[in-house]
Regions:
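Short, glycine-/Ser/Thr-/acidic-enriched flexible segments
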Residues: 15, 41, 64, 85, ...
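Active-site loop/helix belt of alpha/beta enzymes
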Residues: 134-295, 384-386
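Short acidic, glycine/serine/threonine-rich loops at helix termini
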Residues: 47, 70, 90-95, 115-118, ...
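The start of beta-strands in P-loop NTPase/AAA+ ATPase cores
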Residues: 34, 56, 126, 178, ...
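A charged N-terminal "starter" segment
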Residues: 1-127, 172-176, 210-212, 363, ...
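Solvent-exposed alpha-helices and their adjacent loops that cap or buttress functional pockets
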Residues: 70-73, 95-98, 120-124, 147, ...
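Short beta-strand segments
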Residues: 37, 127-133, 181-183, 221-223, ...
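Charged (often Lys/Glu-rich) extended helix/loop segments that serve as interaction or gating elements
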Residues: 1, 269-428
């Protein structure tokens, strides 16, 4: 930390790879694709680590396609989701390799028309998966901002329109229907809603097949959203779920997969590959945000610890009211003598607040914000003129890579030069 300074994200690549191996073992030899959600953490060393374990990539932009390809993910292992793909982004997806990416996940009838037009213009045949809105509301499981499968969400084709969409794709010489997909939301704390989404997808595929449609289907995609425990110790590996699918801590991702795989076989769809799209569950527990303590402040009502990392570095607490554990780096916390301190950042917003945590009476010189490996750096900004944090990558306890910190002078110079020599007109 002394070399990199703070704020700094640190990731354990070996632990991330172990998560992938555990997850893939849960398929028990069945055909599958673990499409890592690049939006969770788009750092090259992380993507290369999951790719080396056989993962593909779930991308949501043309830029993420470039990153995935640049990190060695084969085009056929890339699926592209998103409700508003630009023409240039569609072109990029279609131009990859010999046949384009594995699947463009179309989310509306209008998008089907656009993908067909771009494929025609490029002389390509697009592999397409229809993303279904499953009508499963998980807002009692997760934050409303990351619940994506309910009827009022912007995502996916309505269940009532999926058959029409599938026939539309199959009627086109430029399109090939290869999958049916859905996604309920992120940070799911129980298996039940995930299984509900899977049953919707499997039911639709069964209906399509009975109607003579979907003969070229290669996979079913039940999305990601496997939750982690942000508030206590990470859940035990291979922890068995409760009988009703709920648990005091979220089940392991492998438990989700085993449950949905059993449902897939029960539905008579064992001939299709099963695709899942994990992000958070692979990387969040194995990343921390290191922050220096600037000072303490004690008022009549609150003990404050003010750190140099803020909502510009880790937005989740401000955006989702998320809680991350904060622990001192230089000593253990003695529960018998710990005091409750409110940990806050330097940004000029009251929402720049990491919550109350037990810390020593004499605050530490630095802290670690835990479980910060997902949706941390990828959501960071330079708000309040605070340059992006550094990222460091660790394997086997050794530093294997790091990014460079942008100093404030460089940031200021870029902003000063923005727009060239444009000056306001003189007032007369």
């Amino acid at each position: 930390m002394h070399e990199a300074g703070t704020p700094t994200y640190a990731y354990d690549l070996e632990a991330v790879a172990a998560e992938v191996r555990e997850m893939r073992a849960a398929f028990e030899g069945g055909a599958h694709l673990v499409a890592y959600a690049v939006k969770a953490n788009s750092a090259g060393p992380v993507i290369r680590a999951v790719g080396a374990e056989g993962c593909g990539a779930d991308v949501v932009s043309g830029a993420e396609i470039l990153v995935a390809l640049g990190c060695g993910i084969p085009p056929e292992r890339i699926v592209y989701s998103g409700v508003a793909k630009g023409d240039g982004e569609i072109d990029r997806a279609l131009a990859c390799g010999e046949r384009g990416i594995g699947a463009l996940q179309v989310e509306s009838m209008e998008e089907i028309d656009r993908v067909e037009a771009r494929a025609c213009a490029l002389g390509r045949r697009a592999r397409v998966s229809v993303r279904v809105n499953p009508g499963v509301d998980v807002t009692d499981e997760t934050h409303a901002h990351i619940a994506t499968g309910h009827d009022a969400a912007k995502f996916g084709v309505s269940r009532d329109d999926v058959a029409v969409a599938a026939r539309r794709v199959e009627s086109s010489k430029q399109l090939e229907l290869v999958g049916i997909s859905a996604h309920a939301g992120s940070q799911l704390s129980s298996i039940g809603p995930y299984l509900e989404v899977a049953r919707v997808v499997f039911g639709i595929v069964g209906d399509l097949r009975r109607a003579g449609c979907g003969r070229a289907l290669a996979f079913v995609d039940t999305g990601g959203g496997f939750g982690i425990d942000y508030g206590a110790a990470p859940p035990r590996r291979n922890k068995a779920p409760e009988p009703d699918g709920r648990s005091s801590t979220p089940p392991r991702p492998a438990d989700f997969i085993r449950a949905v795989r059993a449902e897939q076989i029960k539905s008579g769809l064992g001939d299709l590959a099963l695709c899942v799209e994990p992000g958070r569950s692979l990387v969040a527990p194995h990343g921390v945000l290191l922050a220096g303590v600037i000072q303490a402040k004690v008022t009549r009502t609150t003990r404050w610890v003010m750190i140099d990392a803020g909502m510009n570095d880790l937005l989740r607490p401000a955006l989702y009211q998320a809680r991350h554990r904060v622990v001192p780096l230089d000593r253990e916390v003695d529960p018998a003598h710990a005091l409750t301190w409110r940990v806050v950042g330097p940004v000029c917003e009251s929402s720049d607040d990491f919550g109350e945590h037990p810390l020593p009476p004499d605050p530490p010189g630095a802290v670690a914000i835990l479980d910060a490996g997902a949706y941390g750096y990828t959501m960071a900004s330079t708000y309040n003129g605070r340059p992006l944090p550094v990222e460091v990558f660790i394997r086997g306890g050794a530093l294997v890579g790091r990014t460079q910190r942008v100093n404030v002078e460089a940031w200021a110079s870029e902003r000063i030069a923005a727009g060239g020599d444009a000056v306001p007109p003189k007032q007369h």
